[in-house]
């Protein structure tokens, strides 16, 4: 008998979901829906103010389990808004229609509409969405895969006095936070409380400070960054949080820090890395890095 219930921390549901994604990657490989790193960000990144609600996680994740308590899949709302995701075990795709109906019944009344994200290789899921009246405006994002084992050692040039450091070598959280929040908050409004909220994402089991990289000026200003989230057991990484200070763009800094991340990941035994781009500029950069595979994502709305 298959049962479903709300997320419950007391039942170690995060650990169940994290292991589920690790195991699914070993089967799906480049056709994954979520990687472990995204789940870690959902659970530990406290920048989203909605997460202060004690019921946030139970209201935004719902699990399907078999009689032995094995996780068969889950529905998850990443940010507590109208966008949701459905993840089934590779041999349990037949559960997708029921899980979709659950999401529509419980979450559609909360918002003006619903939106989910699926990739081009989810053929059965795409058919189910269309049957339920979901439509798509087109491509939303592209995930690129990179074979680190065949990647030549190459360091993009940096301006004089600039260097790349990780968060073991440079622990200036204030300078790093200024870069993360550029465009969202005035520098003088940055407080220790806000820095602490940003720092919670580093509690993810996929986080390793060795792969949290920044380009730093001679004056110690963090001007470009990326983070490689890793699963050493699967020899895989996801690179996220690629940012460059607006006044330092067009200097090749994002390319330099990502290429350095590739090399450090490769040296540690990581064989494959993924980066997802949602807009033209980032996608052009990520294509320049020499991907070995592509996967297109679509938003389906109702």
Spans of model-derived segments:
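Short glycine/proline-centered loop/turn elements that form peptide/ligand docking sites
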Residues: 258, 279-282
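Conserved donor-binding loop and adjoining core beta-sheet/short helix segment
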Residues: 6-9, 22-109, 218, 222-240, ...
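A structural microfeature
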Residues: 73, 138-140, 224, 254, ...
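Acyl-donor-binding surface of acyltransferase catalytic domains
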Residues: 78-82, 87-161, 298-302
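Flexible, substrate/cofactor-facing loop regions flanked by secondary structure
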Residues: 39, 154-237
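Conserved hydrophobic beta-strand within the GNAT/NAT acetyltransferase core sheet
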Residues: 114-117, 239, 272-277
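Conserved acetyl-CoA-binding loop-helix of GNAT-fold acetyltransferases
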Residues: 92-105, 241-244, 250-267, 287-288
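A short beta-loop-alpha structural element at the N-terminal edge
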Residues: 2-19, 25-31, 163-177
């Amino acid at each position: 008998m298959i049962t479903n219930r709300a997320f419950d921390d007391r039942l170690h549901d995060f650990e169940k979901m994290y292991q589920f994604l690790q195991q699914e990657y070993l089967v799906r490989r480049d056709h994954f829906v979520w990687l472990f790193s995204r789940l870690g960000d959902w659970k530990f990144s406290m920048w989203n103010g909605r997460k202060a609600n004690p019921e946030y996680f139970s209201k935004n994740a719902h699990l399907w389990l078999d009689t032995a308590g094995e996780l068969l899949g889950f529905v998850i709302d990443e940010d507590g808004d109208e966008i949701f995701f459905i993840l089934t075990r590779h041999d349990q795709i037949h559960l997708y229609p029921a899980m979709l109906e659950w999401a529509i019944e419980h979450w559609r009344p909360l918002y003006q509409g619903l939106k989910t994200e699926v990739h081009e290789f989810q053929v059965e899921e795409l058919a189910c969405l269309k049957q339920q009246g979901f439509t798509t405006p087109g491509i939303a994002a592209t995930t690129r895969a990179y074979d680190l084992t065949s990647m030549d050692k190459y360091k993009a040039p940096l301006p004089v006095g600039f260097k790349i450091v990780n968060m073991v070598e440079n622990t200036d959280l204030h300078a790093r936070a200024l870069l993360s929040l550029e465009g969202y908050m005035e520098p003088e409004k940055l407080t220790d409380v806000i820095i602490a909220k940003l720092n919670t994402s580093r509690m993810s089991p996929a986080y390793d400070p060795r792969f949290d990289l920044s380009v730093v000026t001679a004056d110690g200003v963090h001007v470009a960054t990326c983070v490689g989230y890793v699963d050493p057991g699967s020899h895989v990484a996801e690179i996220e949080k690629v940012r460059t200070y607006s006044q330092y763009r067009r200097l090749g800094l994002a390319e330099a820090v990502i290429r350095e991340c590739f090399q450090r990941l490769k040296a540690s035994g990581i064989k494959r890395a993924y980066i997802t781009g949602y807009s033209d500029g980032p996608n052009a950069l990520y294509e320049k890095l020499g991907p070995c595979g592509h996967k297109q994502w679509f938003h389906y709305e109702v």
